[in-house]
Amino acid sequence: MLNLDWFQPYDGVIHSTGVIYAAICNLPRDMRFKRENMLVLGLLPGPNEVSLHQINHYLAPIVNELVLLWDGVTFDNTFEKICGHISALSSCYRCEKKANYENHKYNFAGMDNMSEWFINRNSAQFCENALGWRRCNSNAARNRFVKTTGVRWSELLRLPYFDPIQFLSIDPMHCLFLGIAKWIVKRIWVDENILKPETLKEIQKKMNQFQVPADIGRIPGKVECGEGFANFTADQWRIFFNIYATVSLWKHLPGVDKKILTRFVRICSILVGRIVQSNLMDEAHQKLVEIVKIIEQNYGRDMITLNLHLSLHLYECAKDFGPLYAFWCFSFERMNGMLGKMLTSKNILFLLKLILNSIPLFIF
Ligand SMILES: [Zn+2]
């Protein structure tokens, strides 16, 4: 949303100064007009208000940038990992845990010596290494440096308050629901034939008997489709474990998997709450540790994925950023959906009209 506003900065003399503002409509309505969220795109010095097409001289550089954004901006490969970390698949970016490379893939097994690696990485050391990366003067030198230190430079490190370890939160949506929930059900229970195709039909039948309030969300209806639990979204995994899983899965699971199920359901019910208590967060953390140990002991080291490891950091992220709903990615996913729907000619015209209407000079 753009707006051109004129005001008189001086007393006793007529001198009009203009400002072109932008508000980010992606922000909630109660946030987008806060001072810290408003953008000043241009200043028009005056002393007189510009008229008609003269405004174009001021709009041109702004439009150049908007056009660039509309086309999309590709960052240099260096910034694919925006905070300068190497892929988390080979090394956790919050603690000292390094992935094991076994059977041609990485795993994060090895809970026995947790006290040795469950230690926060050192931010100061990271920043020092990042500066070292900047001093490398060739691609080969930079590659060698990354292999040794696991660190690259990121422009974000120019922010004086930025902590490259603490400020990287784990997204609970990807970690818990698209990561662990999906992994446990599909890769362990379905692939290991604990939940067979005919069992999936029974589970679906049981779920269809549930009568839940309308605002809880759609009942997942694809349990028996495809390879099982087909195309479940993160939200459907959340709903499944919070409402349906215990009743519909209980009689189909052996003892050890019942242990995984009860712990994960409890974890989900604690972590999705709007209010979290530190003692309950502590319980959730302990249960996550137990789940990782149970899976490692019963299904092997290969089954300990990055997400299972990262879930061990959710507790400390919640301490820094608040309840999980306050920093999970569901909100961004909703924006993706909205933006996708806007890409129709009708909506683009609507957006253009909205922008033009917010610039008084364009209303002839
Ligand atoms: Zn870690």
Label each region the model flagged.
Residues 1-31, 57, 61-64, 231-239, ...:
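Core catalytic machinery and nucleic-acid-binding channels of phosphodiester-processing enzymes
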Residues 1-48, 94-97, 247-249, 269:
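Acidic, metal-ligating active-site segments
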Residues 8-12, 29-32, 48-52, 77-78, ...:
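Eukaryotic short linear interaction motifs
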Residues 13-18, 34-36, 53-56, 80-82, ...:
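Short coil/turn segments at secondary-structure boundaries
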Residues 25-73, 103, 272:
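Compact, glycine/acidic-enriched structural inserts
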Residues 49, 67-234, 253, 341, ...:
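Domain-level detector for long, ordered catalytic/regulatory cores in large eukaryotic signaling
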Residues 95-98, 186-364:
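Terminal interaction-prone segments of large eukaryotic proteins
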